[in-house]
Amino acid sequence: MSSPVPLRVPFQGRELHADTLSGDSPLHLFGIHGGGASNRSVWDGLRQSLWQRGVGSTALDCVGHGQTGGVFAESSLQRRSHQVRSVMASAGVRPTALAGISMGAYNALRLSEELDVQALILIVPGIYTPEAHEVPFGPDFSAIIRRPRSWVDSDAWDILGRFRGRLLVIAGEQDSVIPLEIPERLHAAATRASRRELLVVPGAGHSGLLPVLLDNPQWHASLLECVGLEA
């Protein structure tokens, strides 16, 4: 990948580590990684593909991840969105496309409305009840999201019902974390989207989907087309 411009963004007494790549196109992707051991490097392959086609991108390591470090339990869904906004402001970018993996998909979904993006890519999307939004990660957060089907009353359905851009939802057929019902319902909810597609990757689990997608010409094309490119 071309050398990205590193960013060190002050945020609530710490520094967020991020980077941005410029492109000639007016299109710009912002990637939000998931929880666990994930970090912004998960987007490297897609960002390289976009950069080769003139599209810039930005990604960050949220608090508790990657170079940013810190304690995951000191963050929350709400604070992750605040971190994304801080990086966007520092980089001076207003993305046309948001992409999120797992937990990051919920951040992308909620931010899509206020940023009025043209495209939304949700990969193995984690969806949450609004009750969990401000709760710090830890036992209380876990107790909320572990309630059976707690995601049913998520605000995600209404947000996508208002979304008018391009939507790509990607699921792993063998995902043991995110039930297939969630990506199916997200796709179905986007009744006003200008374009919507659901990809279910055969045999895939919850992690490692992006390299698989990029290695498959048809799935790779779906990613590019959602961002706004002709494959």
Spell out what each predicted region is.
Residues 110-150:
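Hydrolase active-site cap/lid region
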Residues 44, 165, 179-189:
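Short alpha-helix in the alpha/beta-hydrolase fold that links the catalytic acid
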Residues 163, 169-171, 175:
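Short beta-strand/loop motif that positions the catalytic acidic residue
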Residues 204-215:
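Catalytic histidine-centered segment of alpha/beta-hydrolase-like enzymes
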Residues 50-69:
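Conserved alpha/beta-hydrolase
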